[in-house]
Every structure is written in structure tokens, then in C-alpha cells.
């Protein structure tokens, strides 16, 4: 990895339906093997199901779900004189978003509904109501950080 300068961030274009950059990032994370149209169908289908079930704006449900899943603090390993400590650190905003998206998709893939569209819509609805595996993952990470609060002075 080059230490000269950080790689430039690529510009992410907003999605065609909602005009939202976060939805595009979400689609890109759902995508397998470069099949963007399949990912688009899955995400828009899930948001359509949410609109049908809740009669609410699907974008606001999505944003609420992502907010409920994004971690504010996590633990990172730090080696100090032969011992490795789990040191709690704050999460940067870009990483918060990336982790939230990743956890939502992983939780959706682990569900038992028949299609990915149904799994994703169910997980997003659960997450927007502070339930589901993605929210549980965030709670576990926060608990781990709280348990290791004694080592917070090793922060870097």
C-alpha cells in the first residue's frame, strides 16, 4: 500500500428513482458480480414492498433503518507491551455508513424469507423499528466498547 497519498474517492452518482447517493451505495453493496440491474431490481422491489406495507415514504423508512444500525463507537485492537487490548474508538462518519449498509445486507441475507427482495424489505422494516439482526449487531458492538471502556486511554 502506497504511503505517498491516499487514493481519491470515486464520485458516486445519485440513483435514478430517488436521487439519493446513499441508495446508490446500498445498491452497490447488494450487487454481486457486477450485476447492477439485478441489485437495482432487488433494492427498488424491497422499497416498493415497504411502501405497500407501511403506506409511508420508503426513503424515510430506509434512512431511519440505516440510522438505527450505524454504530457510533467500536473497538480496535491495540498491542501494548505483549498484551493486546480492545480499545474503544469513535467511528468516522464514512465508516459508520459503510458498516450500517454492510450489516443491513448481511442480516437480510441471513433471513428466511423466500426472495432477497422480501428479506431486505423485512430487515429494513425491522431496523427502522429498532429490531432485527442488524440492530442487534450494533448493540453488540456498543456493548463490547462499553465493556472495554477501561482501556480507552490507549486511544490513538
Curated annotation (Swiss-Prot):
Similarity annotation: Belongs to the universal ribosomal protein uS7 family.
Gene: rpsG
Oligomeric and partner information: Part of the 30S ribosomal subunit. Contacts proteins S9 and S11.
Swiss-Prot/TrEMBL keywords: Ribonucleoprotein, Ribosomal protein, RNA-binding, rRNA-binding, tRNA-binding
InterPro entries cross-referenced by the UniProt entry: Ribosomal_uS7, Ribosomal_uS7_bac/org-type, Ribosomal_uS7_CS, Ribosomal_uS7_dom, Ribosomal_uS7_dom_sf
TM region positions: none
Cellular compartments per GO CC: small ribosomal subunit
Keyword Ribonucleoprotein appears in the UniProt entry: yes
GO MF, one annotated term: tRNA binding
UniProt keyword Ribonucleoprotein, yes or no: yes
Pfam family of the protein (one): Ribosomal_S7
Name of the protein described by the UniProt record: Small ribosomal subunit protein uS7
SUPFAM superfamilies to which the protein is assigned, alphabetical: Ribosomal protein S7
Function: One of the primary rRNA binding proteins, it binds directly to 16S rRNA where it nucleates assembly of the head domain of the 30S subunit. Is located at the subunit interface close to the decoding center, probably blocks exit of the E-site tRNA.
Highest taxon of source: Bacteria
PROSITE patterns: RIBOSOMAL_S7
UniProt record, GO biological process: translation
Amino acid at each position: 500500500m502506497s504511503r505517498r497519498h491516499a487514493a481519491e474517492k470515486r464520485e458516486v452518482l445519485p440513483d435514478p428513482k430517488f436521487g439519493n447517493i446513499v441508495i446508490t451505495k446500498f445498491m452497490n453493496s447488494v450487487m454481486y458480480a457486477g450485476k447492477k440491474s439485478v441489485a437495482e431490481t432487488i433494492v427498488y422491489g424491497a422499497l416498493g414492498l415497504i411502501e405497500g406495507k407501511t403506506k409511508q415514504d420508503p426513503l424515510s423508512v430506509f434512512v431511519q433503518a440505516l440510522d438505527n444500525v450505524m454504530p457510533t463507537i467500536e473497538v480496535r485492537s491495540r498491542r501494548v507491551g505483549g498484551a493486546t487490548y480492545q480499545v474503544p474508538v469513535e467511528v468516522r462518519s464514512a465508516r459508520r455508513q459503510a458498516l450500517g449498509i454492510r450489516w443491513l445486507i448481511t442480516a437480510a441475507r441471513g433471513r428466511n424469507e423466500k426472495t432477497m427482495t422480501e428479506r431486505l424489505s423485512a430487515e429494513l422494516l425491522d431496523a427502522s423499528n429498532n429490531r432485527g439482526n442488524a440492530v442487534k449487531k450494533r448493540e453488540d458492538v456498543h456493548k463490547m466498547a462499553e465493556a472495554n471502556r477501561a482501556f480507552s486511554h490507549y486511544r490513538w
